[in-house]
Structures are given as C-alpha cells and as structure tokens.
C-alpha cells in the first residue's frame, strides 16, 4: 500500500516540478530548479519535524508526501547538470552564485522548516 502513496505523491511532485521548470528562461539562471529545491528543502524540514504529531497515525501519508511528492519535486541530478552546463558555457560567476545560493539556501530553508515544525524526528 505504501507504494501507492509514494506513486500518487510522486505524480503530483513531478507535475509541480514540470510547472516550475517553465520558469527557467534564457537568463542562464535555472530559477525553476532553484525554487523547487529550496521549497522542497523547507517542506522536508517542516514536515519531518511536524511528523511526530501530524503523521503519527498516518505513516503512509508521510511516506507519500516526503518520499513521493518531495522526492519528485526536488532534483539533485538536474542541479548538478545545470552546474556542469554553466561550466561548459564559461558562466563561472553564475555557476558559483547559483551553486552557493542553492546549497546554502537549501540548508537554511530546511533548518527554518525544522524550527517552524517543532522538534525534529
């Protein structure tokens, strides 16, 4: 049964990820990927902390939201590919700005989500 919940969550996460990818414009900054990863990091921290109370009696929903929805929404492989592409295009300044913003922003937003959600699990 958990596979069904992960599948459904993944379906919505993938659709949301696709919609966000339309924000990637020719500016060179993959805004859709940045937003997906930052929002996903925040929600993972928030929902993981909140899960002690909210998902206590619903572990299948937790699995569907965290592994399914957030797993499909966020993307490390696309992030890495975008960094390599920036390197190949000699966009070194953008590579560092995007890379550091994504990495540090993801950690900060995850931490902020944990703090808002309560005690970590």
Curated annotation (Swiss-Prot):
Superkingdom of origin organism: Bacteria
GO MF: fluoride channel activity; metal ion binding
Entry membrane topology: Multi-pass membrane protein
Gene Ontology CC: one annotated term: plasma membrane
Activity control, per UniProt: Na(+) is not transported, but it plays an essential structural role and its presence is essential for fluoride channel function.
Alphabetic keyword roster: Cell membrane, Ion channel, Ion transport, Membrane, Metal-binding, Sodium, Transmembrane, Transmembrane helix, Transport
TM ranges: 3-23, 27-47, 64-84, 92-112
Alphabetical GO biological process terms: cellular detoxification of fluoride
Family: Belongs to the fluoride channel Fluc/FEX (TC 1.A.43) family.
Protein name: Fluoride-specific ion channel FluC 2
Organism: Staphylococcus haemolyticus (strain JCSC1435)
């Amino acid at each position: 049964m958990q596979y069904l919940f992960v599948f459904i969550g993944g379906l919505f996460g993938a659709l949301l990820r696709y919609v966000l990818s339309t924000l990637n414009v020719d500016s060179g900054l993959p805004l859709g990927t940045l937003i997906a990863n930052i929002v996903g990091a925040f929600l993972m921290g928030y929902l993981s902390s909140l899960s002690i109370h909210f998902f206590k009696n619903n572990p299948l929903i937790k699995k569907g939201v965290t592994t399914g929805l957030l797993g499909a929404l966020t993307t490390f492989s696309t992030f890495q590919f975008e960094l390599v592409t920036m390197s190949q295009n000699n966009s070194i300044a953008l590579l560092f700005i995007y890379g550091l913003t994504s990495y540090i922003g993801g950690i900060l937003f995850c931490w902020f989500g944990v703090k808002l959600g309560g005690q970590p699990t």
